[in-house]
Amino acid sequence: MENIARKERRRLNETKRFRKVKRSAALVGTAMVGCSVAAPLIQPVQVDADQTPTQFGARINTAAFIAEIATYAQPIAQANDLYASVMIAQAVVESGWGSSALSQAPYYNLFGIKGSYQGQTVYMDTLEYLNNKWVSKKEPFRQYPSFAESFNDNAYVLRNTSFGNGYYYAGTWKSNTKSYTDATACLTGRYATDPGYAGKLNNIITTYGLTKYDTPASGNAGGGVTIGNGGNTGNTSNSGSTSGNSGGSATTTGTTYTVKSGDSVWGISHSFGITMAQLIEWNNIKNNFIYPGQKLTIKGGQSAGSSTTNTGNNASSGNTSGNTNTSGSTGQATGAKYTVKSGDSVWKIANDHGISMNQLIEWNNIKNNFVYPGQQLVVSKGSSSASGSTSNTSTGNTSSNTANTGSTTSGSTYTVKAGESVWSVSNKFGISMNQLIQWNNIKNNFIYPGQKLIVKGGSSSSNASTSTANNKNTASSNTSSTATGQATYTVKAGESVWGVANKNGISMNQLIEWNNIKNNFIYPGQKLIVKGGSSKASATATIKPTASTPASTTPTASSTGDTKYTVKAGESVWGVANKHHITMDQLIEWNNIKNNFIYPGQEVIVKKGTAQSTPAKSDEKTYTVKAGESVWGVADSHGITMNQLIEWNNIKNNFIYPGQQLIVKK
């Protein structure tokens, strides 16, 4: 080291510190996901970020990393009205250019989304910006099978998260913004707690020109897709053709191609008229990762600069399907195929070809509704010879007629229109959501335009409207009484289980139990029991004072000698336990807390009465864990073994937390 200049030595030291911080923190910002409370149910896999494999060097090529993740970001962003540039920048910031343990195999979590994914979760150290300072915490994060699921899940969060009125991340949608800067501004303080989050994302987007991956909000492919050296394929009407600017090193058919900066697996395969699966198989590509200078085998491919007239039936199929809506294309033979274009989605393709989403997904084994430009999909099975346009026209007329005439007989069907939901359809036909869901085997309340639903038992559209109006008039008052003395309340738009319970002075558990609520799901117009018997007609008058009484902010003693505390908004199990100098285990045990879930207004025991408390043995010695300490460190400092500390305190996966009291002597 003596031969290294002082400035260079300082630079090297700073780089080492930077890498250590990146490895020791899974992410900077954290996504707000409602189901994260479910994570503790799953047996956690303990991972310390400091034990990350040395893979930072593999990701140091920024262009290669961007090219890899852009393969996923671009089609997913287009299908969800999001900015691909913002999604890519988020992945860069949250994963530290793919160097964090969380973003690497086998976790593939690029965005730091907490909770569990299909039962898979991993606990990692993370930095949270709380109370104007950075705090190290160990949190549960989702584990994905690949980057594709990570991008899809992030898009789902941005499109569907709602805590009341409207969607929480609607400010990130292209249709609601003027540029990507509006989207990054919306993410700051919502998606991430870092106050400088927007600036970091904007800097990455401008530095690396990520806007080239964005497309207009309309879903038009114009200018969005880049291949090779920036050639634009978005403005071509023929999905099989390529830009003459796509460049490339391929000199003869069936030879090799040298990857350039900005290339992606999709871009290269598209420019040579082959599928992504072929390119991946021929070159043994893992996780869609390629890098500049890499030579790829292009078997049977054509020169990147040539036309696509020789690509055979595949390109022809793409052209025919792409023109389905504008001309009377050739008849579809058995197993007709369609080549996915930029901006396409599973719903759009199914709708264009007069088939259901389930059929398209089943015929092509589509996972998580993920399709990508250049992918060939089976859009017709059987011997039907009708053209795609004829099928579309017929479907459109059917939908129009259904909408106009409604259902007139028992067991009739209804075609879903754009913007409709399970609630609105059931309300339109005077049936319950449960009936509509049961009759049509609807999953996760998901329906889509063009889907045919059984609305048997419902009246015609006109009668349904009258019935709905009558229902609304009857339920105009917020709370009413039933003949049995039970007070009921009609849910309004934007309300939640907690909100209704709090407004009516009851607990969430009571509201859930009295109304058999599942997954905390309620909907506008639903009537809920908010008082069990002996209520008067003016239920709201007796309930409102209770709701308006402010929650106690200081612990109160109960008749049993227990000290209780009322949970405030934003508090967690750890926060309440830490505030009252008890362990999380004590708080959970005393209050029978499930899944670490507490809610504002809940009264929890924070100190047991003298008669019920269990004093520690006189010869036992306890120690309170401080921030940054580990099982080994605590055991070593008290002259005991790790096994003793673990056994005496029933420690799982070597996980301890600040404020926890541990027995260190028996």
Swiss-Prot record:
It comes from the Bacteria. Its EC number is 3.2.1.17. Coiled coil: none annotated. Its main location: secreted. GO terms for molecular function: amidase activity; lysozyme activity; lytic endotransglycosylase activity. GO terms for cellular component: extracellular region. Residues 1-49 form the signal peptide. Pfam families: Glucosaminidase, LysM. Residues 255-298, 336-379, 412-455, 487-530, 563-606, 621-664 form the LysM domain. GO terms for biological process: cell wall organization; defense response to bacterium; division septum assembly; killing of cells of another organism. Residues 234-251, 382-412, 459-484, 541-561 have a biased composition (Low complexity). The keyword Secreted applies. Residues 232-251, 300-335, 381-412, 459-485, 541-563 are annotated as: Disordered. It catalyses: Hydrolysis of (1->4)-beta-linkages between N-acetylmuramic acid and N-acetyl-D-glucosamine residues in a peptidoglycan and between N-acetyl-D-glucosamine residues in chitodextrins. It is found in: Secreted. SUPFAM superfamilies: LysM domain. Keywords: Antimicrobial, Bacteriolytic enzyme, Cell cycle, Cell division, Cell wall biogenesis/degradation, Glycosidase, Hydrolase, Repeat, Secreted, Septation, Signal. It is an enzyme of class 3 (hydrolase). Belongs to the glycosyl hydrolase 73 family. PANTHER family: LYSM DOMAIN-CONTAINING GPI-ANCHORED PROTEIN 2, MEMBRANE-BOUND LYTIC MUREIN TRANSGLYCOSYLASE D. LysM domains are thought to be involved in peptidoglycan binding. May work in concert with and potentiate the processive hydrolytic action of muramidase-1, which requires binding of the enzyme to non-reducing ends of glycan chains. Hydrolysis in the midst of glycan chains would increase the number of binding sites for muramidase-1. May function in facilitating septum formation and cell separation. Active on M.luteus cell walls and on E.hirae cell wall fractions, but not active on E.hirae intact cell walls. Can covalently bind penicillin. This is Muramidase-2. It comes from Enterococcus hirae (strain ATCC 9790 / DSM 20160 / JCM 8729 / LMG 6399 / NBRC 3181 / NCIMB 6459 / NCDO 1258 / NCTC 12367 / WDCM 00089 / R).
